């Protein structure tokens, strides 16, 4: 093999269900500029944990992922752990929540809120 190979990371995805729920939450807040901030921090039973928050500002190093009018923002450090992930919204017996399907996770805890790489 000759020459350098280029690497383009797989993008992140925001499902239609997550986009619809995010749109409803933004409408409830009355601020159409709000975005869902998704981030990774140390902690949880598997080493890293996911976090969700509203953001009305976007940093220079942030990545924006859109689905229709819904937007999610990920900082550069978190993005490296979330490349290729899908953010979804589910409702069930345990309640309603945003979830992350992360192909980079080598293990997850039972509740799905923390992971290891």
Curated annotation (Swiss-Prot):
**Record bears the keyword Disulfide bond:** no
Q: Which InterPro entries match?
A: FeS_biogenesis, FeS_cluster_insertion, FeS_cluster_insertion_CS, FeS_cluster_insertion_RrpA, HesB-like_dom_sf
Lineage top rank: taxon: Bacteria
Keywords of the record, alphabetical order, are: Iron, Iron-sulfur, Metal-binding
Stored Pfam families: Fe-S_biosyn
Q: What does this protein do?
A: Required for insertion of 4Fe-4S clusters for at least IspG.
Against NCBIfam families, the record matches this protein to: iron-sulfur cluster assembly accessory protein, PRK13623.1
Q: What is this protein called?
A: Iron-sulfur cluster insertion protein ErpA
Q: What is the protein's species of origin?
A: Chromohalobacter salexigens (strain ATCC BAA-138 / DSM 3043 / CIP 106854 / NCIMB 13768 / 1H11)
What's the gene? erpA
């Amino acid at each position: 093999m000759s020459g350098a190979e280029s690497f383009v990371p797989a993008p992140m995805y925001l499902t239609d269900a997550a986009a619809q729920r995010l749109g409803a939450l933004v409408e409830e807040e009355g601020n159409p500029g709000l975005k869902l901030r998704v981030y990774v921090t140390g902690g949880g039973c598997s080493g890293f944990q996911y976090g969700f928050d509203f953001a009305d500002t976007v940093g220079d190093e942030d990545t924006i992922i859109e689905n229709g009018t819904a937007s999610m923002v990920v900082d550069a450090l978190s993005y490296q752990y979330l490349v290729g992930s899908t953010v979804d919204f589910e409702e069930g017996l345990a309640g309603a929540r945003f979830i992350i399907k992360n192909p980079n996770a080598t293990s997850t805890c039972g509740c799905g809120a923390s992971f290891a790489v």
